[in-house]
Amino acid sequence: VKLVIDCRYVRTDHHDGISRYTAGLVGALAELHPLTMLISDERQLRLLPDLPRHRVSSPTGAGEPFVARQVNALDPDVVFSPMQTMGSWGRRYKLVLTVHDLIYYRHGTPPRDLPAPVRALWRAYHLAWWPQRLLLDRADAVVTVSRTTAAAITEHRLTRRPVTVVPNAADPLPDGPAEPARRLVYMGSFMPYKNVDALVRAAALLPDHELHLMSRVPDGERARLTALAPSARLVFHDGASDEEYAAALRGATALVTASRDEGFGIPLVEAMSLGTPVVVSDIPVFREVAADAGAYVDPDDAAGFAAAVRALDDPAERAARGEASRARAATYTWANSAATLLDLLTTL
């Protein structure tokens, strides 16, 4: 089977979630089966393995609906895309598309960094289910990253095609000495559904803990969060390398998130892989990902988050959570996910 993997959503500077998913799967899949990568920018190769590649047009260009005409030149049997928007008109190959989450149907605010016209289209697209159905039913099969999202796809009848769960995994973070510190770590965006406000309020109830916010944050959002709970000890990293992120996690009391919705939850796996406990909102996908390793709190219960963090002051509880975390994280590997994906791609 001649496989082509759409790598055009890989970033040129540093990974985001979909970029990391693509690179992780491609690297592991190449260990199992020959493949060719589709790229749209040579700079993407910085974050991809050294494999055969073919350059085509950008996935955000006006010609995307017709990109299959370029892909046909490779004479592939199957093409896998880590998104659901890959153009398919005129294709002469099997196509597998991916849905990562359905967050924006329930939380309609688009990413703030999109241009205004794209934001308008984003809102319009997520006002109804039928555009998603049209996209997915063009494929021969659909992939998603969690059982929770697969269930939602079924609930809303988003496709007539078979749906396969190919989970995310976490790239190994740099290991090193871990000196225990009263430090809470949040890795994620500051979009409203992420509910960072609840973490800030919880931090105000934990005066002996710092809350480290690792991601880039707009100046206005930083000021708003600081004013929300002036007594909270907030540390804004405004972006962090893998090394800085790992250093923050090692020895931290917990990774925390009060998100109301996710497709998976990669930061949970990253933290658990280092033996760092996770204190997270009680939503189905976090129960799926962390299982018995997690501590779960109502997303609006700041006092509940504070109590769950204080429970980790008990050395025995902290040790048990750390051991359970490492064991749970070990179940998520790119090798396992690639094997699942390869089975799908070679049996269409």
Where are these regions (language model features)?
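Carbohydrate transferase catalytic cores enriched for Leloir-type hexosyltransferases
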Residues: 1-348
